[in-house]
């Protein structure tokens, strides 16, 4: 601050700091040689500065007073060198450091490796002139990346190494995984084709046990002699399967529709005899009949239920017929 020690200058400083912005045009003080700009021109005036504590007008030792709050660092780049009361503009050269000159200082702080940073393109950033003298362009985009001086060089080096490792290693890993995946797919496809070619021709599914019982009850032909060649065996098994499907599929006819009467004449005759003897069967008797007729327990049970419903329907019709015969409707 290039201000004189006269009491008038000190009183000007105290008044300007305490009252903040002054209204009207700029003021010029002859004793101190300071020109103050009006606050309408600059929005950032002196209202943001801190107040001096314990300062009076007529004190001559006001230079030893320390402000309560520190100056704002960003104000240095806004001010001009023409004003004598402002803080001087820092030079573009490197400012002297507080540490001893024996410590070696790096010329530049770079986020990336030194190989990727050509020295020809190093430029100077104005906004970070006090913090970093030089900046280094990144490898991905041509713009400059300013690094503040409070970053340690060891931290930036470690981050740059980790960044390069993360960028290079996953490419090899992905390539190896993709090649292994493709090779495994091709091997699986080859094994599947081999299995399909080596599989023997499968025969049709065998008929269930109840179908065999029905064939035995209907008196089908006995099993033929074992054939000599495998081709004959295949033809015989296919013919037997077709016969068993046609004769033993007791719920569906050849055309695919549901059969009206899935039981054979022999089975129906045996069940009618038992029904005339007893309409309701016990479990033991039902098991005996199912063995004799080559049917399951459930089939015999369903047949007796249907037969009882049929008898009930017939008796109802006969009763209605008898009642209608007595009355003549003319």
From Swiss-Prot:
Keywords from the UniProt entry: Developmental protein, DNA-binding, Homeobox, Nucleus, Transcription, Transcription regulation
Span list, region Disordered: 190-249
InterPro entries on file: HD, HD_metazoa, Homeobox_CS, Homeodomain-like_sf, HXA10/ABDB-like
GO molecular function, one term: DNA-binding transcription factor activity, RNA polymerase II-specific
GO cellular component terms, A-Z: nucleus
Source organism, top-level taxon: Eukaryota
Annotated organism of origin: Danio rerio
DNA-binding region as annotated in the record: 256-315
Protein name (record): Homeobox protein Hox-A10b
Cross-referenced PROSITE patterns: HOMEOBOX_1 (PS00027), HOMEOBOX_2 (PS50071)
GO biological processes: regulation of transcription by RNA polymerase II
Highest classification ranks of the organism: Eukaryota, Metazoa, Chordata, Craniata, Vertebrata
Family: Belongs to the Abd-B homeobox family.
Protein function: Sequence-specific transcription factor which is part of a developmental regulatory system that provides cells with specific positional identities on the anterior-posterior axis.
Chief subcellular location: nucleus
Subcellular location, record wording: Nucleus
